[in-house]
Amino acid sequence: EHDNLINANFSLDILRLGFKAGNLFVDFNWRYKYNTELHYSRDFLGFFVNGNGNYLGHDNPADFSIGADMSLYSEMALGLQYKINDKLSIGVRPKVLMGTANISVNDDETKIYTDENTYEMTADVNINFQASTILNVDDVYSFGDFTSHFYDMDTIIFDEILDVRENIGFGIDFGASYTFNEHFGVAAGVYDLGYIKWKKSKVKHNHKDNVVVNDALIDDFNDLMDMNIDLTDLYTNLVEDVWDNDSIYDGGDYKTSLKTRIMLQGYYELTPMLRVTAISQLYYMNEKFRPALTLAYSG
């Protein structure tokens, strides 16, 4: 009911250098990474798709729990891979992280009520918002102000990206591979284990009861009826209208975890041109590890 997820990731290599010395391979990598994670309750979409007729009465609210975690940061890593023998290789990649921007929205208790007699829609609102960026946010006082700053990301220069005085984090990747014979091998690894500490944050903690939200939600209903659905606009409208686009304030430092991934892989190679691979992974999303299994064939 509360555990629906949308996840997107983007990575751009800016610089990569490497060399080999005997059984040791060393590489330096500088990349820019973006990841976003949205999680929402079943009622969040069901309310718009099925209407509010299923949520009549104060004892039958629509659960509007929703959250987001979006981060943009650069990563400098030094990779070391060592071949112990013909069968076993190990590797480690420590990383320094420099955060550009983060937005975290946590809401676990917002409820939408529909009066069974008047059909007036009200909300009990509970939201926690925190955000940080290397941009100047002295003039940011609301959600709208903060959102507009993200359109200025293309003005960031390299001096700001490499500013190691704020939004610093550390991470590590490590793993090993073992080849049993010419046909069969396995590998295991842990990727993106680490955190970023964000400074100069903006925060908002909003708890309100009986907020009238008819206008905000009816506009979104009309968009759905016209098949004019923009999830970004829908999400923004809810934040501004349901959770209120009022003041946000200066906050303290906070940490966010990287999206850690644990991987176990095995392959069977019939010929150099024919391989079957199985990959089992655990992704860390919304404070839980989520399993995934991939089967691949190449030939």
What are these regions (language model features)?
Residues 1-299:
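Subset of outer-membrane beta-barrel
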